[in-house]
Amino acid sequence: GKAASEREGIRTKINIKSTDLSLGAFDWQQEQTVEFILENTGERLLVINDVLTSCDCTTVGYSKEPVHPKDSVALSVTYMAEQPGRFDKIIKVYCNADSSPILLRITGEAK
């Protein structure tokens, strides 16, 4: 409908210092957490609608509040290995930024 397309029209821009973070090598039984920082560089509020992960081993915590222009939001990504081995996980962030969905990646080796 018309309303949806108008909502779609409210876009902002974001900057992410790094979209790809390595957790390095770690004991597979130890939970690992890293932070991705999304900075709202546009002129509108940034709203994160949804964050999807490629498996249950990866969870993401973040503030559900809209992010004001020039402010940032931290996405705290926690990885709990199900077994030892290398991993490469994608996190999809759906938001009202031009580049949505944003793909974030974590890699590493659980030993």
Stretches found by the model and what they are:
Residues 1-41, 110:
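Beta-sheet-dominated interaction scaffolds and their linkers
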Residues 21, 71-77:
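Short strand-edge motifs at loop-to-beta-strand transitions and within beta-strands
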Residues 28-35, 82-90:
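Short, solvent-exposed loop/turn segments enriched in Ser/Thr/Gly
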Residues 34-40, 77, 90-94, 106:
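Buried hydrophobic-core signal for structured, non-transmembrane domains
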Residues 41-44, 83, 97:
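Short, acidic/polar linear motifs in exposed loop/turn regions
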Residues 43-72:
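Surface-exposed binding patches on compact interaction domains or structured appendages
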Residues 85-111:
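Terminal connector regions
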